[in-house]
Amino acid sequence: MSWKKQSMNRMPFIASFLLALASASHLAMADISTERQSELIYLLKQDCGSCHGMTLKGGLGPALLPETLYGKPKELLVTTILEGRIGTAMPPWKTMLTQDEAEWITVQLQQGVK
């Protein structure tokens, strides 16, 4: 069988895997209560805003707007939230946030925090 045919035969499997992965990520984020979501938005606007600007348009840290985050891998943003950035003022938040919460915050930032 040619390489192209082998690749085509794997496409349904790959598509199913990616769909399952996306669904699992969505379900994990859905477990964050409405109350906790409100707390996270407050944290984002107040704590993150103290460095990234109260409107998240930038300050000590870079802007956190959809257009400035466009194209950045979600995993990179989540890791930055949880682990911080060595050599910068960006602290790690892993003692205050779960992986799911960091993913939820990332989605909010990519969509534009309201």
How does the language model describe each region?
Residues L44-M54, I105-L109:
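The canonical Cys-X-X-Cys-His
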Residues A22-L27, K114:
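Hydrophobic alpha-helical membrane-insertion segments, chiefly the h-region
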Residues P66-K114:
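Extracytoplasmic electron-transfer domains, predominantly the class I c-type cytochrome c fold
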Residues Q46, P62, T88:
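Glycine-centered loop/turn positions within well-structured domains
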Residues I14-A24:
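Bacterial N-terminal signal peptides
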Residues K57-G58:
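Short, non-ligating residues that shape and space the ligands of small metal-coordination modules
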Residues H26-L43:
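Electrostatic cytochrome c docking/interface patches
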Residues W3-A15:
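Bacterial N-terminal signal peptides that target proteins for export
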